[in-house]
């Protein structure tokens, strides 16, 4: 066993003595040592219940004949960090999480790992670590939150609250109505109830094969989560016995399938960023062109909030992720069904008995929302290395208009609230990319303000930053190269005409190459917004969004 490094031989007597101080007995040294990587954090509603959840995981690991050791990672709640400097720490926290898990697990030579993530950057951070460490691993997340209901009976979620702010600002609802939405938008523990980033990544974790069937959709408050925990411990023991590791599971074909599910469900645009980062950790050469190819062959079968009033509890009721995958598998060439997963079985075996129980929630191949996926990769002179749009969250397929430019999210939000943006405009928020932000902050507050003011179908928003999974409308993010790297978005001037063509996958500015070259020669890179601390270091090391915004190791040669 890998853990023999710290527990076997006469020279490991000091190690065993220390381990006995934690409560271990002599008989425990013949069992696998399992890292329980938890993320219990009281300020994050999706993680508040994970302290008790972790205890259940440890009990299940002991029952399976292994020895659990629990530790915690950090985390950032994107909703609470939204709209202020705290959001700059969200994406960088993914790297800290990955590094901290690597540190604890490799320093102590664990034989296997169970990861307990749930929200925002915590799931992808742990997934990156699992691929980097490459020991047998199973993920079991905390589960989605239930949707809420206002006193009037309206179904609401976190995106409803953000959009309520814009609606109140524009006089569409009263302060009492906003308070009603606020009080009922997040009614329980769990990851926010729509197809936002947390739930998108937990669903992708399931199809990648790192988590068990049901992981993405069973609610946090559902007793079936406890059964999932027991199964996770039992399956981990099998993975250890068969020496099946994350890099055996997360192949190019698995990533294809993850993006295929993402396209079928119209998941968060953040999944592109995180899954590209996973490919980097797995040593795979996977780029945005391959994502676009997946998008072209996968129909859009589900619309989940913010694209509709359906939530994760409805997906679960309708058959869960397995039912979606089973329906997708009917179309030849969409999924790779014979690859291994954390169950110890193939994807084909995992979904064999699944079925759609509500075809209003999960559409059939014969009745898709669209013939192509709910996420699309756009390219053009404004995004030579690519950009991402959640096409499933807008009915608009082509938009052209003059740009209104803001050099930060704060500047943009103030401008939107002051009425500087009107119908037909293209809002540009730049210098908010991985390096320029730094940290590539999410733009939920501006998109929600636009939607709340009733302009969601009449105003486009383009940025080198990111969007929350709760964003909707004509929102194009991840524009690469970013402004801080001298990308075309940095060269735009007020009133330039920008064209977004979702059908043709184009993102263009109606300015000649000669004029753009002239502007590039005159452009000067702004001073970094942050020069010290973690964000200062991050800005110096982070790469572009089109490669997952991973950190690069400095070359000292």
From Swiss-Prot:
One example of the protein's molecular function in GO is: magnesium ion binding
Cofactor-binding details, from the entry: Binds 1 [2Fe-2S] cluster per subunit. This cluster acts as a Lewis acid cofactor.
Which coenzymes or cofactors are required? Answer: [2Fe-2S] cluster; Mg(2+)
Task: State whether keyword Metal-binding applies.
Answer: yes
Carrying N6-carboxylysine, the residues are 121
Q: Which Gene Ontology BP terms does the record give?
A: isoleucine biosynthetic process; L-valine biosynthetic process
Pathway connected to this protein: Amino-acid biosynthesis; L-isoleucine biosynthesis; L-isoleucine from 2-oxobutanoate: step 3/4; Amino-acid biosynthesis; L-valine biosynthesis; L-valine from pyruvate: step 3/4
Q: Which residues form the active site?
A: 468
Ligand binding (Mg(2+)): 78, 120-121, 442
The UniProt entry's sequence similarity note says: Belongs to the IlvD/Edd family.
Check the record and name the NCBIfam families matching this protein. ilvD, PRK00911.1
Subunit note: Homodimer.
Q: What is this protein called?
A: Dihydroxy-acid dehydratase
What is the species listed in this Swiss-Prot or TrEMBL entry?
Bacillus cereus (strain AH820)
């Amino acid at each position: 066993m890998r853990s023999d490094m710290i527990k076997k031989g006469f020279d490991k007597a000091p190690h065993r003595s220390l381990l006995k101080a934690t409560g271990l007995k002599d008989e425990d040294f013949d069992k696998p040592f399992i890292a329980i990587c938890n993320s219990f954090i009281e300020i994050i509603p999706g993680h508040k219940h994970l302290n008790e959840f972790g205890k259940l995981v440890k009990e299940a690991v002991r029952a399976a004949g292994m020895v659990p050791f629990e530790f915690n990672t950090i985390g950032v709640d994107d909703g609470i960090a939204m709209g202020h400097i705290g959001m700059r720490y969200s994406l960088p926290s993914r790297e800290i999480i990955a590094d901290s898990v690597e540190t604890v697990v490799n320093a102590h030579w664990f034989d296997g790992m169970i990861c307990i993530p749930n929200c925002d950057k915590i799931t992808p951070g742990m997934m990156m670590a699992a691929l980097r460490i490459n020991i047998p691993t199973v993920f079991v997340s905390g589960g989605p939150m239930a949707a809420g209901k206002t006193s009037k009976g309206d179904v609401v979620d976190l995106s409803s609250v953000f959009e309520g702010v814009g609606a109140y600002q524009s006089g569409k609802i009263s302060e009492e109505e906003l308070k009603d939405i606020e009080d009922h938008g997040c009614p329980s523990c769990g990851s926010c109830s729509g197809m936002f980033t947390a739930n998108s990544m937990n669903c992708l974790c399931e199809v990648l094969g790192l988590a068990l069937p049901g992981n993405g959709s069973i609610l946090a408050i559902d007793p079936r989560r406890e059964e999932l925990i027991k199964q996770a411990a039992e399956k981990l023991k099998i993975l250890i016995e068969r020496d099946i590791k994350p890099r055996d599971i997360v192949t190019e074909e698995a990533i294809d399938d993850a993006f295929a599910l993402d396209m079928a469900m119209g998941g968060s645009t953040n999944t592109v960023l995180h899954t590209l980062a996973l490919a980097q950790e797995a040593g795979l050469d996977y780029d945005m062109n391959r994502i676009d190819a997946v998008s072209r062959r996968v129909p859009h079968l589900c619309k989940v909030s913010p694209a509709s009033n359906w939530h994760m509890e409805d997906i679960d009721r309708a058959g869960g992720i397995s039912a979606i995958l089973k329906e997708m598998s009917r179309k030849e060439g969409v999924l790779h069904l014979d690859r291994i997963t954390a169950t110890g079985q193939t994807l084909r075996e995992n979904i064999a008995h699944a079925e759609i129980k509500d075809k209003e929630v999960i559409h059939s191949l014969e009745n898709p929302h669209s013939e192509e996926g709910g996420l699309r990769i756009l390219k053009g002179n404004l995004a030579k290395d690519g950009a991402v749009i959640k096409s499933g969250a807008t009915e608009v397929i082509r938009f052209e208009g003059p740009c209104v430019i803001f050099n930060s999210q704060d500047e943009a939000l103030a401008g939107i609230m002051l009425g500087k943006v009107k119908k037909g405009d293209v809002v540009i928020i730049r210098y908010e990319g991985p390096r320029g932000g730094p940290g590539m902050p999410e733009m939920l507050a501006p998109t929600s303000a636009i939607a709340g003011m009733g302009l969601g179908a009449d105003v486009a928003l383009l940025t080198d930053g990111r969007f929350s999974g709760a964003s909707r409308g004509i929102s194009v993010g991840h524009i690469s190269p970013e402004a801080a790297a001298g990308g075309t978005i940095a060269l735009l001037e007020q009133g330039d005409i920008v064209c977004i063509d979702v059908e043709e996958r184009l993102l263009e500015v109606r300015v000649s190459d000669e004029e753009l070259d002239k502007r590039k020669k005159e452009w000067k890179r702004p001073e970094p917004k942050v020069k010290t601390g973690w964000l200062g270091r991050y800005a110096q090391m982070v790469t572009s969004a089109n490669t997952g915004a991973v950190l690069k190791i400095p070359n000292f040669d």
